[in-house]
Amino acid sequence: MRNCCQEHRLSAGHLEPEISSSCASDVKSSPDMDSVSSQDSLYLPNSVGASLEDQDLWAQFHQEGTEMIITKSGRRMFPQCKIRLFGLHPYAKYMLLVDFVPLDNFRYKWNKNQWEAAGKAEPHPPCRTYVHPDSPAPGAHWMKDAICFQKLKLTNNTLDQQGHIILHSMHRYKPRFHVVQSDDMYNSPWGLVQVFSFPETEFTAVTAYQNEKITKLKINHNPFAKGFREQERSHKRDDVLKTLQQSPSKRQKRKKWEDSPEAEISDFPKATRVKEESIMDPAGVYQNWVSDHEANQGLTPHSPESDGANQEQQVPSSSSNFYNRNPYRRSSQHLSSPYDLGEPSSRRLTPDVATVPDSDPDSLAVLHVIPTQNSTQDRTCGVNFSMEAQMKQPLRGAMYSPYGAEQWMVPAQGQYRPMGYTAYPTDLSTQGAVAHPHSGMSDWSQYSLFPYSCW
């Protein structure tokens, strides 16, 4: 009897199959068990039982030869392993584990709609045991509801590091359910072990379904099967075909709309539909762009050079004022082509200075130039302004002179040493070359760079 109990403890540590009947009888007749109360005798190891859930579904698969898909990343089982336990002590803690053992030592193949042996089985990989995530838990927790191993996955990757069950393809296996009494998975010793297995759960591991009947059963009972997704795609294709059947009438309506005048108007470019706005001279609005001499010549609000519409508005800036005061730079520019005049302003990138449009020589012959009096340079304005609100304002002269005389005042004599040259004249137009008494570079070092304090 002692030898049997020692073998029983060894089997509990290594998760061996069921306890033998002789050992179980010895446990019942032991003197230690006689002192156990009648209430505790209800929770003896031999009183623990288990039943398979979804047994009818498992029976349908077992009749055709159950197949389970295994992949490199791991695949869940269907039908799922689901059992129900009873006879456990409600306050004692138990652990629930599952492992898979081969049914025989053969490798199988699918031939002529049946499985047949095809040789010796491959060496079994290291046995792995899947521990239920709720372990350890009191017996009342395990007996409360059916226990499902939903997250259990099967793989054929021998180097798997995710804890999946490693199996060989074309081999037959069966799952075993172990009930272990233990308060802790690692520290406390394991108690008595009860092992359960069900013949309906036997299956053949495959990488692809071999039996078409098994495939149909999977599609009909597994809501996550691939066949359901293919069926949804077929429904979508049917919807597309229905829309294609209605498309001729829609195309006919589209054709009628294209023949209507509204479609012709919508096909015109945006530049041709832009409302032409009246043009006015910049002298009436931006007086700082035109000198006093030109403002007094009585320029008309409508520029004769611009017959087309132009949506571009020129905003005065510091650089634009300098540009209009420099006749040499302005004379080097050209007029823009007439196609640029009708282009929307949102698509044109205007520079900081006031630009003068360019044009080809043929278009220059059409434009008329207003000659200015007492001036040898052509200062015609090639920019059109579209601001109707400012047309009624009278033409005015410049609001300020370019420079004041105070900026060119000669510094006090006490600040710098006496020099042999005169200060700059107030009239900027009469400035000329100034003769300096110093001819060498070394003589310039005793004076400041600028003889005037303008900033």
Curated annotation (Swiss-Prot):
Task: List the record's Gene Ontology CC terms alphabetically.
Answer: nucleus
Instruction: List the stretches of this chain annotated as a DNA-binding region.
Output: 57-230
**Biological process GO terms, please?**
positive regulation of DNA-templated transcription
Where in the sequence does UniProt note compositional bias of the Basic and acidic residues kind?
A: 229-241
Task: Report biased composition (Polar residues) as residue ranges.
Answer: 308-326
Gene3D superfamilies, per the entry: Transcription factor, T-box
Q: Does the keyword Transcription regulation apply?
A: yes
Q: Which GO terms describe its molecular function?
A: DNA-binding transcription factor activity; RNA polymerase II cis-regulatory region sequence-specific DNA binding
Highest taxon, organism lineage = Eukaryota
Q: What is its main location?
A: nucleus
Keywords attached to this Swiss-Prot or TrEMBL record, sorted alphabetically, are: Activator, Developmental protein, DNA-binding, Nucleus, Transcription, Transcription regulation
Tissue spec? Vegetally localized in oocytes and expressed in the presumptive endoderm and mesoderm at early gastrula stage. Expression is down-regulated in the endoderm by the end of gastrulation but maintained in the lateral and ventral mesoderm of the blastopore lip.
Q: Which SUPFAM superfamilies match?
A: p53-like transcription factors
Q: Where is the signal peptide?
A: none
Cellular compartment(s): Nucleus
* Ranges for region Disordered: 229-276, 295-360
**Role played:** Transcription factor required for both mesoderm and endoderm formation in the embryo; signaling determinants and concentration levels may determine which germ layer is formed. Acts together with beta-catenin to activate genes that are responsible for mesoderm induction including wnt-8, eomes t/bra, siamois, mix1 and sox17. Directly binds to promoter DNA. Patterns the mesoderm along the dorsoventral and posterior axis. Activates siamois gene transcription when alone or in combination with beta-catenin, but inhibits siamois transcription in combination with pou5f1.1/oct-25.
How is this protein organized at the quaternary level?
Forms a repression complex on the promoters of the nodal/nr1 and siamois genes with the maternal factors tcf7l1/tcf3 and pouf5.1/oct-25. Interacts (via C-terminus) with tcf7l1/tcf3 (via N-terminus). Also interacts with the other POU-domain transcription factors pou5f1.2/oct-91 and pou5f1.3/oct-60.
Q: What is this protein called?
A: T-box protein VegT
